Amino acid sequence: MSLNPALKFRDFIQVLKNEGDLIEIDTEVDPNLEVGAITRKAYENKLAAPLFNNLKQDPENIDPKNLFRILGCPGGLRGFGNDHARIALHLGLDSQTPMKEIIDFLVANRNPKKYIPPVLVPNDQSPHKKHHLTKEQIDLTKLPVPLLHHGDGGKFIQTYGMWVLQTPDKSWTNWSIARGMVHDSKSITGLVINPQHVKQVSDAWVAAGKGDKIPFALCFGVPPAAILVSSMPIPDGATEAEYIGGLCNQAVPVVKCETNDLEVPADCEMVFEGYLDRDTLVREGPFGEMHGYCFPKDHHTQPLYRVNHISYRDQAIMPISNPGLCTDETHTLIGGLVSAETKYLISQHPVLSKIVEDVFTPYEAQALWLAVKINTHELVKLKTNAKELSNLVGDFLFRSKECYKVCSILHEIILVGDDIDIFDFKQLIWAYTTRHTPVQDQLYFDDVKPFALAPFASQGPLIKTRQGGKCVTTCIFPKQFTDPDFEFVTCNFNGYPEEVKNKISQNWDKYYK
């Protein structure tokens, strides 16, 4: 039987194993910092995804055999072949699919006509219905929840799971990712902030006077396509389950929760159920985030998720994301998916759609940059200049209603010509440093809000003003705006004539024996 890595988490793991991209660690590993340190080393060196089969257990863990193992780096980069293999597998694509094609696949499949609703299946088709813990049996503090970073304010149980919430009128069921930290034996606290959909859905309950008891489910080890789409900036009100069905051309099987009316993926490792209490606020964080820092004194006041039921499968596996220095899931998923949605939105723009070929958030910039590749021959036809182009791009991506939420994480948009491969950071940074005049070729947008998690925003004056810090940088030579035949020779291998390059490539083994 063929494997389905997009819709079955264990199949995803098996494909990684089959392709030599999984390492099973049977040596005992302490979830207190050791798991985090190992995963960080794996991310930063593009090593195989680690599956921790033998976590150091609290003697009071009610079911140490099945609660639980940990999979690290599920969306990290691969160190051989196609580096984006794990992201491709999340979508059921061939593991050799490069990031540009992944982005194009997401753009091509954004059509709402292709949405396929989930299908409700019996509980016996759901492995996580095997074991159950009641409210009285639950003690989250006894589970092997990892302390991922040295500066974290607590143990973050939720870094790669999926929250499920539904509006009171049941018109919108939202699947999303937002971090969650163990607060006490039976509750989790996590970020419930704008522009996240979990905030918008829970706001509807608050407006109805029921903000203290909002039903939720927290699912771990969900279909990889589900966790990817849960990271996507899809339109408000859109249902992720239908979106996933459209992407995979197959309905997502779902089952009913045990203590509320929510439906969750049938293919889960663990499901926590309970209710979100927006009226009770507690200390949350800090947590090492996507930009590579943890500030120990930076904590927040956030609401509680009260857990009253846990269901789980045999030898359950909890996938985790350990954010930090590139490249991890906060870059490959969040940054990559912002690239896809931005490319789609640009394709709908009457002017930019004619000149923009590709967009990408380079990981080396921690998803704070967006590189935009411009067709310079089409650019000439616009009869514009650098300042006007920068204003057009920035006004649309930073200010417009369509793009504001999608591009909220971005602080600098970099425009380059079509000779640059924006997926190659070496080329991008070369163009950035040599083709723009600092300040002169940068247009600032001081009226837009900064991304609060960006370290220069959270640790500087922007945290008070909450305005500015964003710009568009034009790395296109002035003559390229007016002369379609403007020529320059790049002093690298690709700059040589084709016949010379072909001859060199054919005879390379003779030169370097």
From Swiss-Prot:
Enzyme nomenclature, EC number: 4.1.1.102
Named cofactor requirement(s): Mn(2+); prenylated FMN
Gene3D superfamilies documented for this protein: 1.20.5.4570, UbiD C-terminal domain-like (3.40.1670.10)
GO cellular component terms, semicolon-separated: cytoplasm
GO biological process: cinnamic acid catabolic process; ferulate metabolic process
Species whose genome carries this gene: Candida dubliniensis (strain CD36 / ATCC MYA-646 / CBS 7987 / NCPF 3949 / NRRL Y-17841) (Yeast)
Keyword terms: Cytoplasm, Decarboxylase, Flavoprotein, FMN, Lyase, Manganese, Metal-binding
Cofactor detail note: Binds 1 prenylated FMN per subunit.
Record-given protein name: Ferulic acid decarboxylase 1
Protein family per UniProt: Belongs to the UbiD family. UbiD-like/FDC subfamily.
MF (Gene Ontology): carboxy-lyase activity; metal ion binding
Binding site for prenylated FMN: 174-179, 196-197, 240, 405
Protein encoded by which gene: FDC1
PANTHER family reported for this sequence: 3-OCTAPRENYL-4-HYDROXYBENZOATE CARBOXY-LYASE-RELATED, FERULIC ACID DECARBOXYLASE 1
Compartments where found: Cytoplasm
Catalytic center residues: 289 (proton donor)
Pfam family, one: UbiD_N
